[in-house]
Amino acid sequence: MRSSIRGPSRRRRNEALTRIVEKFFPPLSQEFDRLLASLAGQKLVVIGHARPDGDCIGSQVALARVLRSRGFDVICVNPDPIPRRLQFLAQGMTFYRTDDVLHSPEQRAAIFVDCADHARAGDRLKGRYPAPVAAIDHHLSNVGFAPFSLVDSAAAATCEILAGIFLDLGLTIDAQTAQALFTGIMTDTGQFRFNSTTRRCFVLAGELVARGAHPADAGYQLYERETEGKLKLLQHFLASLRLECNRRVCVGILPAGIFESTGSNTEDTEGLVDYARSIDGVDIGALIEERADGTFKASLRAKDPAYRLDLVAAKFNGGGHACAAGLNLKQNTENFYARLVAAFAERLAAVDAAKKAPGH
């Protein structure tokens, strides 16, 4: 005999979940509402950063779709193409490249997403849109480069901010928008395991699943479609790992020409630096990408936000978060490796000293 006792319906469970947090980002939601009012009648462009990741593409897709549902004419522009594994998010949408808009006479109000500063979209897009109307971002190093600055460095992802704002304001989140937002949160939290992952992340993720996001689809597209070239690149990266600072820092190097020799490309570097950080006893991991012209790109990761890698990156005109930062040197810099390791050593010493201070 089946019990007549039933639990709450799915609708009631979803309503209860929404009530757990009445408002996710009250000040930013009010600011976004004012932004929408100020943009009435204008054409818009949503711009992301170079080498776009899940949070960047997810933010662009979601924001563009919500703005279109409000009647706006919106396009998305990136300096680089959408990575192969993220193309599922933008199905049915056109993403333009820098050259497509550089000489267009069409005027559009620019909204930058997931960009800590104006230049993250590249110098040419910065020049094409010198006065963005808004920036929506979560980087600790954000410099506040737009009149409407919707920035919260406590958020794990720009998609987290957008999801909260859309829910706060009761804006329409369809299944594709939910998938984009969920994927952005999932990737920037390291599949919900980084220090930035909060209760709010899980509540928002649940709301997005209720609106059509499929975690399994995101997991398959992102983590179960590796190419042979990516695995060859990983092999070279692991073989290059060096331990520094009494084995508390691990650095891997990708030499110039490695993409051609392995049949990989720049998007295949995604996630490699996490292997350097994952070693037991290592506090900081780094990936250095050397270029043929002698310049460098580096990705930095820490296990503890106390190490403030955004400060390390800032020494080289980079930026980011306390646990995840990056830099891109456009000019040849002698002894870059030694200088970077020295900067790591300074942060380790500062954290060690703080832990020994009275009252810690």
Model regions: which residues?
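Glycine-rich, phosphate-binding/catalytic loops in enzymes
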Residues: 63-64, 127-130, 151-152, 203
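Active-site cofactor/cluster-binding pocket
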Residues: 94-148
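Metal-dependent catalytic neighborhoods of phosphoester/phosphodiester hydrolases
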Residues: 87-89, 122-123
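Hydrophobic helix-and-loop "lid/oligomerization" segment in the mid-to-C-terminal part
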Residues: 18-50, 56-87, 102-109, 187-360
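Short, hinge-like loop/turn segments at secondary-structure boundaries
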Residues: 92-95, 129, 151-154, 303-304
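N-terminal amphipathic/basic-hydrophobic helices that include classical n-h-c signal peptides
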Residues: 1-19
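Short alpha-helices
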Residues: 136-204
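Solvent-exposed alpha-helices and their adjacent loops that cap or buttress functional pockets
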Residues: 102-105, 125-128, 142-143, 173-175, ...
